[in-house]
Amino acid sequence: MNHNTELNRSSVRCLFPLGQLVATPGALDLLDRTETNAQTFVRRHQHGDWGSVPSEDAEANQRAIETGCRILSSYFVNDTERLWIITEADRSATTLLLPEEY
C-alpha cells in the first residue's frame, strides 16, 4: 500500500457516532464460523458504504445522517449469508444481527 492511499483512508471521517456496539448470538456465530472480522463491516457502515441495500434504503440512510433516523446496512459475509448493521436513530447503539433476528 502506498502512502497516498493510506492518507486517503485516514482522512475519511466517520459520518455518525455508533454508540454502544452490540451483536446478537446469530451474528456472533456467523462471524465466528466464517472467521470474519466485524470491524471491516462496522467501518464500512460508519463511512457510508451501506453494502447490499436497495437504492431507496441507501438514500434513506444518507438522509438519516442529517435527520437523526435509523441507519441500516446489509453485507454478504459469504455467498448466502448476510449481516445487518443497524444504528439507532438516537445513535445510542449499533447492533450487528442476522436479518431473521430483526
For each feature predicted by the language model, list its residue ranges.
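Short, compact, well-ordered microdomains
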Residues: 66-102
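Compact soluble domain cores
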Residues: 7-72
